[in-house]
Amino acid sequence: MKTTVKLSFMMFIEWFIWGAWFVPLWLWLNKSGFTAGEIGWSYACTAIAAILSPILVGSLTDRFFSAQKVLAVLMFVGAVLMYFAAQQTTFSGFFPLLLAYSLTYMPTIALTNSIAFANVPDVERDFPRIRVMGTIGWIVSGLVCGFLPQMMGYSDISPTNIPLLIAAGSSVLLGIFAFMLPDTPPKSTGKLDLKVMLGLDALILLRDKNFLVFFFCSFLFAMPL
């Protein structure tokens, strides 16, 4: 299998996983009797994890571990956490598991990008084609967990825990597939300190007006997520 095909499949499953549970989650939580505030806190898990994940995973991966191996481990652990989260019926049982799951998933977004960047011959030419498969994966997850089952004569699965189980199963699939990805060894060898772990050394990039505009637009774009 060609490297670009492997990377495209990786990106497809990566975003399929998130779309499978994230979009229909509120339907299941509402049906299970969760309050509006509890549903809001559940959706906040990914945002909290996105803030913490660079500290917990990003800096360590850059220096000590191959990206594809970390991806595999995080996917396997995430699959277990998502499976048990899908069995919960109370907020006190569900929220900690979803938060823990989010802490394993959110770092994989950067990991898959790093793996793709490191293993394509021409980033400007090849990466957009690979990354668009992630968008397609998100769309397909909406079809699979949305109206497609009803079109095939089955009952609606969106207000059930099945989308979460689909996400768990897809995580196992990507965890296994990660061992087939090209080796992406750590590149950074610099000193690891709190400033680096928090990403504060990257703030110097904000001096570039073009990057500042990009940063601000990305911030606004990510708010609904």
Kindly give the residue locations of the regions a language model identified:
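Helix-to-loop junctions at the C-terminal end of transmembrane segments
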Residues: L52-S66, P149-G153
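Residue-level signature of mid-helix packing/kink "hotspots" within the transmembrane helices
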Residues: A47-I55, I139, L143
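Hydrophobic core of transmembrane alpha-helices in multi-pass small-molecule transporters
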Residues: F12, L81-M82, F91-L111, I115, ...
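Structural signature of the two symmetry-related core transmembrane helices
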Residues: K69-Y83
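Transmembrane alpha-helix termini and helix-breaking/packing motifs in multi-pass membrane transporters
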Residues: V140-I166
